[in-house]
Amino acid sequence: MPRPQKCRAIAQDPEYRVFGPFCVGKREDEALVMSFDEFEAIRLADVEGLYQEEAARQMQISRQTFGNILASARKKLGEMLVLGKMLNVKGGNIMISQEERIFGCAACGHQWSLPYGIARPVECPSCSSQNIHRMSPGGGFGGGRRGGGKCRGFRSGLDRGPGHGEGRCQGEGHGNGNGNGNGQGRMRRNQQEGGEV
């Protein structure tokens, strides 16, 4: 029986998760899957230029394990480029090692950060609005995550978007996620009684 896989620390979720040739006819179900830890290994070794020993220390794994992850990631990149396959970045037994969470206020635009381990703020420190959200690394709303515990494990696409809803009848909708949300809105009294508005 193999040993359980140890959590791998990554700095942040990748901003882009789907890669491939720009042509019609490529199906996403035939795509290669690169885990978050493989993506992080490519980032540390090839983009940041770190030696494997230092990169392994940052991911909190052994140098040998880092080398295996890096070799697997490079093989998938090669297949994507040479064979023209799609590549999806998702899954893996990971934990986010980013030291601070970034929050933003939708009312006044104020941004601030708090270290992990401190409770989520209830209101904006600038304007006291309760319309606050986690910010993604790129600066937009939607950096929140589900899951609990130290390792998040096999995540894919769990970031929540800002939400845009359209209410029924005349009223304001409240959306969940990207696109049209599940807004309910408020009906005017005349409509509730069957009259015209």
UniProtKB/Swiss-Prot annotation:
Ranges of Basic and acidic residues composition bias in the record: 157-171
InterPro entries xrefs: RNA_pol_sigma_r3/r4-like, UPF0251, WH-like_DNA-bd_sf
Ranges for region Disordered: 138-197
Annotated Pfam families: DUF134
Compositional bias per record (Gly residues), positions renumbered to this chain: 172-184
Gene3D superfamilies listed in its UniProt record: Winged helix-like DNA-binding domain superfamily/Winged helix DNA-binding domain
PANTHER family, alphabetized: PTHR37478, UPF0251 PROTEIN TK0562
The family this protein is said to belong to: Belongs to the UPF0251 family.
Annotated protein name in UniProt: UPF0251 protein CT1277
Native source species: Chlorobaculum tepidum (strain ATCC 49652 / DSM 12025 / NBRC 103806 / TLS) (Chlorobium tepidum)
Lineage of origin: Bacteria, Pseudomonadati, Chlorobiota, Chlorobiia, Chlorobiales
